[in-house]
């Protein structure tokens, strides 16, 4: 199967008896790029719903996409400490896209993948379906001063791919999506959010 993420997603829908008529609930758990952070203001701001990928994906597909992004979030150490994750029985897909802030704090791609494995493993029996998404690679900018940091962000996708295979969960690789970052090299531009939503929807065949 060429598109593994789409295969797992559609298989999940079939198992749960879901179809295009019934909306699927997708919890999008991530950092500031899921939240929709706009770094252009002095204290930062948030893009409007029409320019955030979670809201765009919901409008594009007709499915309920819940924005559970938070600025500065790293991979949680203890999933049971998060009230949001104790209600997974009400969510059909748990989409997680984290790791960028771990890299910015000095972790390597391998270390980030290890943290993600520790986070996801206890969630496996509690979630109907987990979808692991590799964050788009960073680019040189105000927050990304070295090529080494860019390289680690590129390597993260490969580490996540291996992890997804190990955990037998679907994986989406965004390395070649060319998501446009702002001046800081990290956060999506408004157009970047639109491209991300479009490509993710196609990846999942939504």
Where are the language model's segments positioned?
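Alpha-helical cap/lid subdomain in secreted, periplasmic
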Residues: 51-55, 60, 80-206
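Internal alpha/beta domain cores that form substrate/cofactor-binding pockets in large enzymes
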Residues: 73
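Serine-esterase "nucleophile elbow" of acetyl-processing enzymes
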Residues: 4-5, 13, 18-70, 82-90, ...
């Amino acid at each position: 199967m060429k598109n593994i993420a789409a295969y797992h997603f559609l298989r999940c829908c079939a198992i749960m008896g879901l179809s295009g008529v019934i909306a699927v609930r997708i919890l999008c758990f991530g950092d500031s790029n899921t939240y929709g952070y706009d770094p252009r203001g002095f204290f930062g701001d948030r893009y409007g719903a029409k320019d955030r990928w979670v809201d765009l994906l919901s409008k594009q597909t007709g499915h309920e996409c819940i924005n559970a992004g938070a600025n500065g979030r790293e991979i949680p150490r203890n999933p049971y400490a998060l009230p949001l994750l104790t209600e997974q029985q009400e969510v059909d897909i748990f989409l997680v896209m984290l790791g960028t802030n771990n890299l910015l704090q000095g972790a390597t791609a391998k270390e980030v993948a290890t943290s993600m494995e520790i986070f996801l493993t206890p969630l496996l029996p509690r979630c109907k379906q987990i979808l692991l998404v590799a964050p788009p690679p960073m680019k040189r900018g105000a927050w990304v001063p070295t090529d080494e940091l860019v390289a680690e962000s590129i390597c993260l996708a490969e580490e996540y791919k291996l992890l997804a295979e190990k955990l037998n969960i679907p994986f989406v690789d965004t390395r070649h999506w060319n998501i446009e970052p702002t001046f800081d090299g990290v956060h999506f531009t408004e157009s970047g959010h639109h491209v991300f939503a479009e490509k993710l929807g196609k990846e999942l065949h939504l």
